[in-house]
Amino acid sequence: MTVKEHKVVHEAQNVEALHAPEHFYKSQPGPSYIKDMKQYKEMYKQSVEDPENFFGEKARELLDWDRPFTRSKYGSLENGDVTWFLNGELNAAYNCVDRHAFANPDKPALIYEADEEADNRMITFSELLRQVSRVAGVLQSWGVKKGDTVAVYLPMIPEAVVAMLAIARLGAIHSVVFAGFSAGSLKDRVVDAGCKVVITCDEGKRGGKTVHTKKIVDEGLNGISLVSHILVFQRTGSEGIPMTAGRDYWWHEETAKQRSYLPPVPCNSEDPLFLLYTSGSTGSPKGVVHSTAGYLLGAAMTTRYVFDIHPEDVLFTAGDVGWITGHTYALYGPLVLGTASIIFESTPAYPDYGRYWRIIQRHKATHFYVAPTALRLIKRVGEAEIPKYDISSLRVLGSVGEPISPELWEWYYEKVGNKNCVICDTMWQTESGSHLIAPQAGAVPTKPGSATVPFFGVDACIIDPVTGIELQGNDVEGVLAVKSSWPSMARSVWQNHHRYVDTYLKPYPGYYFTGDGAGRDHDGYYWIRGRVDDVVNVSGHRLSTAEIEASLTNHDNVSESAVVGIADELTGQSVIAFVSLKDGSSRESSAVVAMRRELVLQVRGEIGPFAAPKCVILVKDLPKTRSGKIMRRVLRKVASNEADQLGDLSTMANSEVVPSIIAAVDEQFFAEKKK
């Protein structure tokens, strides 16, 4: 591989842009919302040059208002007072449920794919309206009112969606806590948000295993007088679930007492719709605050224009409502547009690796949205299942959560999409609310490995991290920032606006700082590098850890890799690579030592001597969040001999791997340094 000058986005060299396959157009229920690149550019230009009129028109078109807004946009990033749709009033639940229930009562709203397929069910918009109203009635009878916070600790079942919409119906604020979090993590989030009510279930089911959900809630809330009521849904119906008299109430008993329709409460555009906690590098998790109108519009617009979603379509987002992906693209995005959403409780491997494809075949899903982590798993061990099912209904394949490598992109396109689908690699984050960089399906040609172009209103730019100056033109690399506000961006951190300003608005005054490194290629397409702290500067060479990781995973025996930079007295930083092998080897032996040397030489040969890892550490597994992201900051701390300063680990799914990683670093890195 030829090494390009470091400022050039070399991944884009000799990469041809792909236009939408013929199948995409033939299978559409209606014309594309954006027909071609020319129309995208015209709309994008208006969205950044005249956002007031552009988004004002879209807000009136896509949302129903109780009171019209008087001005579309106010405030600035500099002042941290971003405001959209001033003086307008609306209700999120009405926009997601009522208006569709009145127009198409029997249309599917939620398609539930349970852990055990025999438990599958479907909920129409009219039934969803009844369920949401009844749960809202229960909450209202308990004194929940506009502006109150309510915690939701439920697995990925329809009742999680019902609970969120019931809270929004009252103008209250939902704070969903992923049902895989520990009792301590739940406690921290409930207390920080000030939730007096928690909605949960008796037990959960995932991958054929039972999760003792209510037991976790009881443990987390032990001694917490703040919580006065807990509503418990019977997911499994198991006997012996402990219920505290005067605090715990069964969902089915309480909802039976309520009316089937409860009028929605009008909310101001800027009233908080929800909190969602995201883990910081250190300290306590941040409760990111999203507003009602701006967030809803962002969810609606990106779902419509990025995915080219029509009301007749079926969207399968394989993400949990405990994360922003589930909020925006399993709930609010599809439902505000009146599109059916598949709610998936299980895993891609249960009861076998054909599960995803059976779901798509059974419901004729048109859109599939999933994380690269799941795709890598299927590519490694489940690819043979794909041809067994008719998944020709698919039109758009989405990727979310991390940059997708060009190799995995092409596999997704060929093996899952059969070269008939558009691939939408989407870059966004909890704080953005909806897509920041993503192709508009059918209009924007795509490139394997590139998230492509900014969404409407996202005035994206590349900043030199050293000088803080915006880099003009194409073929530039730096950090990704946004020059002005967009409707769905987070407004604050719960009860800590200073933290919000310090984290996102202060690093580069006048810009929103995404925290991601990126390159803008010769065509103006964006290539996401990952977190800025995942960029390593070795002897003046800025190295993308993703590029080094790609080189490592090109080796036939490498399963996964993660690269971090640590301080180095000679070179400023040095590259440390953590690698898990397909054969599971991690202990020292002559073969393992040879493998470590071989991997160093591979990077040296493919990228250059300056990119060669100082050390390759073989581990059995890498630390990951519950959404599948590798926690590189944990690896960096361990490699920096700071294993006693790992910070917040509440989002880690496999904390049991940490001791073995520490041992591997001691054996393969620190011990060798002493020799």
UniProtKB/Swiss-Prot annotation:
CoA binds at R206, G207, G208, K209, T325, S539, R604. Transmembrane segments: none annotated. ATP binds at G401, E402, P403, D425, T426, M427, W428, Q429, T430, D516, R531, R542. It catalyses: acetate + ATP + CoA = acetyl-CoA + AMP + diphosphate. GO terms for cellular component: cytosol. It is an enzyme of class 6 (ligase). CDD domains: ACS. Pfam families: ACAS_N (PF16177), AMP-binding (PF00501), AMP-binding_C (PF13193). Its EC number is 6.2.1.1. Keywords: ATP-binding, Ligase, Nucleotide-binding. It comes from the Eukaryota. Belongs to the ATP-dependent AMP-binding enzyme family. This is Acetyl-coenzyme A synthetase 2. The lineage of its organism: Eukaryota, Fungi, Dikarya, Ascomycota, Saccharomycotina.
